Amino acid sequence: MNNKLYGNLIFELSHEGRKGYSLPENTFGNYELPLCARRKTDAELPQCDELTVVRHYTNHSENNFGVNNGFYPLGSCTMKYNPIVNEETASMPGFAALHPLQPAETCQGALEAYYNMQKALSDITGLSEFTLNPFAGAHGELTGLMIIRTYHQHNADHKRTKVLVPDSAHGTNPASAAVCGLEVVEVKSTPDGLVDVDDLKTHLDDTIAAMMMTNPNTLGLFESDIPEIARLVHECGALMYYDGANLNPMLGACRPGDMGFDVMHINLHKTFSTPHGGGGPGSGPVGVGKGLEQFLPRPRVVKDGSEYKMDTEYAGISVGEFLGNFATMLRAYTYILSLGKENLPMVGPLATLNANYIKESLKDAYELPITGVCKHEFV
């Protein structure tokens, strides 16, 4: 509750001379700060006693709304389940107290978790290697497109400057392509909401760098022609990009790598239970198929015998400082371990079952433009 006693701002409760701190005995001696490091005026900090500070922030904390006290509606493809055990792992002192500049030999446990997460995502998706460096899903998407662009430039195939994007794609797909300096070419959908393969064929030539797809697509439909689509795109020399926003219903059913995709990003909040929105920060790991590993951004964690090290080869390939949002990765890794290989494959079927139950419950009250079985979401 809000009340006048504890105010809306801690500054409103400030009184000259009140303090709620005590410092330990000075055992280091007194040292004069150089003039360049001294403030010219006192810092404008509130002066409050301990009880006032505790009660003020406790009072405001009761106004918070989140997944622990109510339904937190975000995008339909975003998980609404953020297990508390994930937070316990991420806040363990052995992880939370680390400094990103620590020598690798002093944080082997953290690097082992990071390395194991890379391998877990490879197993789940069927792709060769992963980087966990991108700081969000859209950041991962842009990183994936930059990998594709670099791959073609490495092969001196500079004319490939176009990206095929279905008209049912997520809005981030054309946006990421444009930011990457690539031209977007729209591919039409059939009346059933799937990619029109005949229309796709009219766009395929030696200027195409990649095709971006979400499978299932934004309508919640599985693209059943994906083997044919992948074959056609590869035959023209382009790569297949998988937008992992809708990966959740695929767990236990099929893997993007097995469908013919070469590059993908994963939204950890959409598939592996990490917080989203105000509960962030995000994380957008990027995976690549065989032959593309050298284009992944650095640094990466590698295993040398029984030791974990930082791979800084091709150090110029970077998408941000250090190793991404480490604590977010820990939350997702905890979720994967808590389910294990036996239960993780049940995520997809259960997500599909839940969505179809809701769809059938609403069909008499809402118009359904697309009929039939959906995956994890529907329109």
Feature locations, PLM:
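N-terminal glycine-rich, Lys/His-bearing helix-loop that initiates the first secondary-structure elements
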Residues: 1-97
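Gly-rich Lys/Arg/Thr-decorated short loops/hinges at beta-loop-alpha junctions or inter-strand turns
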Residues: 37-38, 92-105, 123-125, 178-185, ...
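Conserved N-terminal alpha-helix of the aminotransferase class I/II PLP-enzyme fold
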Residues: 43, 49-64, 93-135, 140
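Conserved phosphate/anionic-ligand binding catalytic regions in large, soluble enzymes, centered on
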Residues: 65-86, 133-141, 272-287, 322-328
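A glycine-rich phosphate-binding loop feature that marks nucleotide/adenosyl-phosphate handling sites
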Residues: 73-82, 134-140, 166-169, 246-252, ...
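Conserved PLP-enzyme active-site core in the AAT-like
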Residues: 109-112, 139-304
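Structured alpha-helical segments in the cores of large, soluble enzyme domains
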Residues: 110-122, 170-174, 196-204, 229, ...
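Active-site C-terminal subdomain of aminotransferase-like
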Residues: 263-376
